[in-house]
Structure formats: structure tokens, C-alpha cells
Amino acid sequence: MREEIGSFHKFCGALNGRVISEFNYRYSGENNAQVFVGVKVISDDDRERLIAYLTGLDYRVKDLTESEMAKSHVRYMVGGKAPSLTEEQIFRVQFPEKPGALYAFLTHLGGRFNITMFHYRNHGSAFGKVLVGFQCSDSDCNLIKKILDELNYPCQVETHSEAYKFFL
């Protein structure tokens, strides 16, 4: 996916309200982001229509539905250290498991911040555990926390976590 402020929001909007079961996104350079997304479809035909629709919007789509390696391993490996990324802030956030929660979050951000990383997977509980990165200064952390508070999405800043420093 092309990496620019608002591209994540635009992609989620292109899904037209479909249920997202998993979303792994990582900035991987000035103009590129790696995305691994699980979207609920009702049939093989529905999946093919979605792929054609997204391809028509210039998204590069690779259907990994039948890949056991992707389902068992690759989904957890999207990302790594982002080259040339400065001022990244990491948040661990609880999203309510309800339709539109992600889109509401992106809409409230209003294109003010470049999202550099996003990891979510539906585990069937009342809240989804999300890890999200923003390209922003330390001082902008308070604004992001305020936005999350307004949405009632509890969060914890993880920028100084050893796991983040070592792997991401």
C-alpha cells in the first residue's frame, strides 16, 4: 500500500464496512507499507469481487487464503524495524469489538498523524488488543492520548518497551 498520511483511513473506507478480523500494517519506507488483512467474506465469489474491487482502486492484492504458512506464521511477522523512521511513538490500545470502531478511531485522528504500525486480531472478546505506532513528537503523545480518551479507548504508551526497541 502506498504510504502517506491518511492512506490507512482511505483503505479502511474502501472496505465499505466489511468486518475486519485481523489487520497488520507496518511502514516500510518513504512510499510503502506492508499490510496483512483478514476480511470476512460470505463466499468465494464475494472474495473474488472484493479482490477485483480493491485491485480496481490500485491496491496490490495477494490472496493468501489457502496459505497455511501465512495463516500460521507470516501474520505475526509483518513489520520489523522501519528504515529511516524518526520520532515513532507506540501505543497499546483497547478497541471495542464492534463494527466501525477502527474507522471511528481513524476519523477522529483526522489525518493529523502518520500511522507507522498497526496490529490487531479479533480474539472473540469484548475488546480488541491493538498495537499502533505514530510518527510524531513526544509532545504529540498527549494529543493522541486525548483523542483515545475521547473515544473511551484505554491506552498505554509503549515507546520505551524493551520488546519494541528490540524487534520493531
Can you annotate each of these PLM segments?
Residues 1-168:
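A conserved regulatory-domain signal marking ACT and ACT-like small-molecule sensing domains
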